[in-house]
């Protein structure tokens, strides 16, 4: 199977990327700079009804999103620390939503989305609501930061 996969991949390009399959719980973590503090809004567990969390799963309800995620406190703390560290290390200042797979209590970062969805079905607004921050306040915070930056 691997030889055929290589053949198909190299038929498309002369470079390919091979990654290990991470079999674990998928979580999404919202992080924002709110009133001068880096805040983890929440950790949402993604329970797909399909094999992958694709467009249908994300926007057409083919997955269950559980906030807060069903993880132990030690894992929660690890995920929050990594999410904050990644956000700050990348010099982020607005909204972000990062994705992780948790295997045996170890979080593996998959990606960071710097332009997360803001529809009522989107994860970040749901996390903000649970955290106690309204969308109005979240967006107002961004406007205030932009105005302050332009005054400099």
What spans do the regions from the language model cover?
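Phosphate-binding site of ATP-dependent enzymes
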Residues: 1-81, 108
């Amino acid at each position: 199977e691997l030889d055929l996969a290589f053949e198909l991949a190299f038929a498309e390009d002369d470079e390919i990327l091979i990654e290990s399959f991470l079999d674990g719980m998928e979580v999404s973590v919202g992080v924002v700079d709110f009133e001068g503090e880096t805040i983890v809004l929440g950790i949402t567990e993604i329970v797909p009804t399909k094999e992958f969390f694709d467009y249908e799963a994300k926007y057409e309800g083919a997955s269950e999103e559980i906030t807060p995620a069903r993880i132990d406190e030690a894992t929660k703390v690890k995920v929050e620390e990594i999410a904050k560290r990644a956000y700050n290390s990348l010099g982020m200042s607005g909204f972000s939503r990062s994705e992780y797979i948790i295997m045996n209590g170890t979080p593996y970062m998959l990606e960071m989305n710097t332009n997360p969805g803001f529809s009522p079905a989107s994860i970040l607004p749901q996390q903000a609501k649970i955290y106690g921050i309204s969308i109005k306040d979240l967006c107002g915070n961004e406007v205030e930061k932009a105005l302050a930056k332009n005054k400099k």
